[in-house]
Amino acid sequence: MQRYFIELTKQQIEEAPTFSITGEEVHHIVNVMRMNEGDQIICCSQDGFEAKCELQSVSKDKVSCLVIEWTNENRELPIKVYIASGLPKGDKLEWIIQKGTELGAHAFIPFQAARSVVKLDDKKAKKKRERWTKIAKEAAEQSYRNEVPRVMDVHSFQQLLQRMQDFDKCVVAYEESSKQGEISAFSAIVSSLPKGSSLLIVFGPEGGLTEAEVERLTEQDGVTCGLGPRILRTETAPLYALSAISYQTELLRGDQ
């Protein structure tokens, strides 16, 4: 069944007998899927609830829906994982956002690292963020997520440091930790986090984080960790981390 994310909370949807879908979703429902009155879709509210809905009326700029039933499906990771990626070259961040969304990331924080080759001014950063947000939304629909991960504004390194106290735990993926055999810290941290906790994981761009950046991150209570015995690419490391978290918190621990 086709899935759509709508900009209403569950409470707002329940306040009236029917609710309306507008914007780009209408084009997809009407012109791409060619749906009509009586067809059913899945709607996901802004606050992560999903409902089976029936189309009551269809026009070129608005679709009215009736909730048939709310479901209890929860496809979000038990912990909220924030992926902070030092801006990589090319379209690598698009790949990280698309696949990271499929693997359950809660949000993405692109930041300007010392070794980032890419330099974005405000205009380019805004345009990029719009594209990244669209990629996250499409990936969330495809993977049947309850929520669309938020793609935040491009941060400076200083802005990233200032945000670190917002999270329950912060991990710094550092290749020197892998080289030194420190591969158990990441698993221990994930195991210690209760359901609903927030975890920030910081990844460097190509070439990794500098020693100075790592030092400043650890001064803000970031914990350096290796991600296995092998050195991973900047676009591979976040996906490895998310897969490991999914295994440990969903398959192994069985949290729902």
UniProtKB/Swiss-Prot annotation:
The keyword Chaperone does not apply. GO terms for biological process: rRNA base methylation. It catalyses: uridine(1498) in 16S rRNA + S-adenosyl-L-methionine = N(3)-methyluridine(1498) in 16S rRNA + S-adenosyl-L-homocysteine + H(+). It is an enzyme of class 2 (transferase). Gene3D superfamilies: 3.40.1280.10, Hypothetical PUA domain-like, domain 1. It is found in: Cytoplasm. This is Ribosomal RNA small subunit methyltransferase E.
